[in-house]
Amino acid sequence: MDLEKFRNDVYEMTEKLSKNLKENDRSKLNYVCQQLIEMYKKNLVKINHSVLELICASNLILRGYSVEVEKSVSDILVCDIYAKKGGGYTIIEIETGFTPPDHAMDTVDYYAARIMSKIARYSQHCSKFSLATPVMGILPIPKIFLLPPNARKKEDVDKVKELCDRYYKNPPIKYEDILNAHLHSIYLINIDKGFAKELDPQGYVDLTQSLLERSEIEY
């Protein structure tokens, strides 16, 4: 653990991002920065993920949100970004595409199931749920989450649940959580330039669909 290097890196990114914020909003980003430093001391975060969280937090603060990171929202769930504005709550989960060695032989299915499970589990704890990813990655967004709950077919919900059940058993993902899940947006994060751009889910799928189809990935 190199606390000095971590602190220097998050301070550097915070200073860079603060240039785009109003003076009275900079303290909100500094609060997030200090949260991350304290969590690093407890070995709860890593620098690559922390930088992504800072960029997403800056985007939300710019739009009037108050932001916390690594916040517990249930007995088993800790979200990356938890933001409040007025009476509404936003959760952002950042996906980098990492998969553990245990799933070296089923990486695509595992990754898709993780995305499905996050949408199903986290979206019930907020008014708006979003996924975020570095610009180098592509998220396989299941088509079912582009539809409102009343337009989702039972066989499509069952298909998502069957895949999730392969990887999530304790506890399993509930049928009702998949049926009622909602995905508000996708954030594309440019780490080098320090910004995140928000896309609606349908727009993101339209942009990435042909690449995923070439790779024979469809959920």
Task: Indicate where each model-derived feature is located.
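Catalytic cores of nucleic-acid endonucleases
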Residues: 96-159
